[in-house]
């Protein structure tokens, strides 16, 4: 829009410069006649050619900018980028001093337009960095939750294995009457077996005591018999000695 307005202003300036020249031609006609009219027309043509020769660079640049703006408006899907002007030594319009002053506005506009996409790129990079940080935070949370669940599962497995090894079993649900009767019968059988073992141990201990008593009495009787026989022997020997004497 700015470039189109500039083109309109240039055309208005050219049109405003044309009427005084026409008035000058009319005065020349009144004063000098037809010969002077032809000379004035030639002079006007030369002046117009000089003006146009000094202005073509600006017109070319304005037309180029207007065409580029139209292309940018038609291709709205594509991202806007700054204009890059090629500087060639053969392009006398870009190097001419007359066009340098008029092109200052276009240069500033191009620099502004170049800065805008750079700012947009920086904002996009900031957004991507924020998104990447958010994704990293989510991944860390997921990894923490997964590690916690794995540790909890490992603890449960260890507890269950310890209980199984230690024969610690919990009965789930309500026990039936038959199950209770079976448990009671098993307890009675265990108690009866324990009593039998205790009685057998007591019987074995009593029999051992009886055997020890019998052995002690028999040993005492044997000692008495041995001592009595020895006495008789000793008594008989002196009598024999006396008899021998």
UniProtKB/Swiss-Prot annotation:
Phosphorylated at Ser-67 by AMPK. In skeletal muscle, phosphorylation is induced by exercise and seems to increase muscle contractile function. Residues 1-12, 23-32 have a biased composition (Basic and acidic residues). Signal peptide: none annotated. Detected in brain, liver, lung, kidney, heart, spleen, skeletal muscle and spinal cord. Residues 87-132 have a biased composition (Polar residues). Residues 1-245 are annotated as: Disordered. GO terms for cellular component: nucleus. It is found in: Nucleus. InterPro entries: RNF111_N, ZNRF3_Arkadia_E3_ligases. Residues 169-187 have a biased composition (Basic residues). Residues 202-226 are annotated as: Required for interaction with CSNK2B. The modification Phosphoserine is found at residues 66-67, 143, 145, 147. Residues 203-219 have a biased composition (Low complexity). Disruption phenotype: Kockout mice have an increase in white adipose tissue mass in both sexes and a decrease in heart mass only in males but no difference in the mass of other organs. Upon treadmill exercise to exhaustion, mutants fatigue earlier than wild types running 20% less distance. It comes from the Eukaryota. Pfam families: RNF111_N. Keywords: Coiled coil, Nucleus, Phosphoprotein. Residues 175-200 form a coiled coil. Interacts with CSNK2B (via KSSR). Interacts with JUN; the interaction is mediated by CSNK2B. AMPK substrate important for exercise capacity and skeletal muscle function. Required for normal contraction-induced signaling. This is Protein ARK2N. It comes from Mus musculus (Mouse). The gene is Ark2n.
């Amino acid at each position: 829009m700015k470039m189109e307005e500039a083109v309109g202003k240039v055309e208005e300036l050219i049109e405003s410069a044309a009427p005084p020249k026409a008035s000058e031609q009319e005065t020349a006609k009144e004063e000098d006649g037809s010969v002077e009219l032809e000379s004035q027309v030639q002079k006007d043509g030369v002046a117009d050619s000089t003006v146009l020769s000094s202005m073509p660079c600006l017109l070319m640049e304005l037309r180029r900018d207007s065409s580029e703006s139209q292309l940018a408006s038609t291709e709205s899907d594509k991202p806007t980028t700054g204009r890059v002007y090629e500087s060639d030594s053969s392009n006398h319009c870009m190097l001419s001093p007359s066009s340098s002053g008029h092109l200052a506005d276009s240069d500033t506009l191009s620099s502004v337009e170049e800065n805008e996409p750079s700012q947009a790129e920086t904002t996009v990079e900031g957004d991507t960095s924020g998104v990447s940080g958010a994704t990293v935070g989510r991944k860390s949370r997921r990894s923490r939750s997964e590690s916690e669940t794995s540790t909890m599962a490992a603890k449960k497995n260890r507890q269950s294995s310890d209980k199984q090894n230690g024969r610690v079993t919990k009965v789930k649900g309500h026990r039936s009457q038959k199950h209770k009767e079976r448990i009671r019968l098993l307890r009675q059988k265990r108690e009866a077996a324990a009593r039998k073992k205790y009685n057998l141990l007591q019987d074995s201990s009593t029999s051992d005591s009886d055997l020890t008593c019998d052995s002690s009495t028999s040993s005492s009787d044997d000692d008495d018999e041995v001592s009595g026989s020895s006495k008789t022997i000793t008594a008989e020997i002196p009598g024999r000695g006396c008899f021998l004497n």
